[in-house]
């Protein structure tokens, strides 16, 4: 029987007390949920310390308790801040660290850890949170031998039966397929389950695994083919700046292949999709070929034509292309008050005029004090840029044009004090 000061018992008492203290009239609001999450992070800190002291089983059991407590809390607490999700992610990482370590220890510890994960994954707390259930079960794969793998698959069968009649079950089915594949791969080896992998390339994670395998084997043509197939399938509907995007994955394949021309081609494509980070990538690639100065104006022109004005304007600031930046914010003034700070020193009159036109339109559309405050905030910014004369002109103009907007006149008085 565990002592009262055992890590798991401490975790139970601390989390229980925190939930009780932060439950108000049966409800756990935003700030209360954050308070509980901070206490859970403290428990995970203790788990990390225990792990460093080689108290692996204690750390693992407490990590798992924190995870299940979080999942239960997610069903009724207000996690608007996202702190609860952060705790879950950290708990899963620590569980993974523990299972990877325990997998190298004696059979009894492996069996205990596997049994605990399977027991916890069955709990109703995970109903409706299948992604976390499958993530937890994935941490158990490294603990399995052929016999225990069969037990894990039997458990997966029961989960699959539960969702057979569920209309919103495709995601769960994919999770099941991926988890089974990883289990089979762990037991049999990658080569033995290659057909299983390629039979499920419609699942994005399976395709990513196939790309990684091909790249590791230096089969860059295969990795390229796998990426291009998915990019074509997406048909331009998806692009994010995350490493998991297929255009970014393809660029990584080209980087590992060492083929400079393809690196440049793909980096340019990603830049023109609006990812400004690839401006520096292209710059380095062109500089290595000694062609940067000739390619730069061509690239700027293409970026301008791509219609990703925010990306284009950000690059112009980076390259100190102030004249082109002035032209760009004249055409598209959405981010004027951010980029004006880079222009006002060299082009004061032009900047003041652009700001004045922007503020006039802003004031014309404003209908309440909250919006009038934004107008006056921009007027005050104009004053900071030494555009006092323009600001005074606008204040006088607004007072004459909108004499019945008492809230506006009230806010304008605050601006006049700064003139």
Q: What spans do the regions from the language model cover?
A:
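Eukaryote-biased, non-catalytic alpha-solenoid scaffold regions
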Residues: 1-419
